[in-house]
Regions:
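Extended, solvent-exposed, turn-rich assembly/linker loops in the middle of proteins
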Residues: 20-106
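Sequence/fold signature of self-assembling virion shell proteins
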Residues: 34-46, 86-213
């Protein structure tokens, strides 16, 4: 949910007991960009092209300040291939505790490359196992995500439709624990915790997602 909300401003929610539904946060179309003909980074001169103008233009589409760029390896290789980008990339700046905390346990799949002005450059290779059993990357190939490290989602909870919870006066709760006994030989005691979280992105325009070609 969270990754798709950032990438597309929406996601599909589905389960065994309800129909598939699309949760759309209403991201502006200008915040999902695909590099057009003649603008592709792969077709630019590596010695003379400066990607600064493009990056500034992309960042301007966000509703707030952008201070981090997260990309896959394909985008990083393109960017780092530009001479003018390498000359401006600061790899010696001092510590940033907030950023270090965010990536400290992800050293094998997340790499902090440095700062491009005030923009932290991070390469992510995180993956997950899809329903078909195939490992897939969270970031599709050629994806650049621009955002702010302070951006945060909200975990919302729907109503737990349990008559016992209602009879106990549970009106609003993130989780509802319950236990019950069954009569028999042997008798059994069961425990269960019910929860219905839904990830919400309050401002989907905080992020700008670029498909780099």
């Amino acid at each position: 949910q969270a990754v798709n909300a950032v990438l597309y401003g929406k996601y599909t929610m589905e389960g065994d007991q309800f129909e598939k539904i699309e949760v759309d946060f209403g991201r502006s179309t200008k915040n999902n960009i695909t590099q057009g003909s003649g603008k592709e980074w792969s077709k630019q001169d590596r010695d003379t092209f400066d990607p600064t103008h493009d990056l500034d233009l992309y960042c301007d589409q966000a509703s707030g300040l952008v201070n981090i760029a997260i990309m896959d390896g394909t985008v990083w290789r393109l960017l780092n291939g530009f001479k003018l980008f390498r000359e401006k990339l600061d790899t010696r700046r001092g510590s940033n505790s907030q950023l270090e905390t965010a990536v400290k346990d992800l050293g094998a799949v997340v790499s902090f490359k440095g700062y491009y002005g005030d923009l932290a450059i991070v390469v992510a290779k995180t993956s997950y196992i899809a329903e078909d059993g195939i490992e897939k990357r969270y970031l599709p190939e050629g994806t650049l995500v621009l955002g702010n490290t302070a951006a945060d989602g909200i975990r919302c909870y729907g109503a737990i439709q349990d008559a016992q919870a209602l009879s106990e006066g549970v009106v609003a709760s993130s989780r509802y624990p319950k236990h019950w006994l069954t009569v028999g030989d042997p008798a059994r005691e069961f425990t269960m915790t019910q929860s219905a979280p839904l990830m919400v992105l309050p401002d989907p325009d905080e992020f700008v997602v670029v498909q780099v070609k």
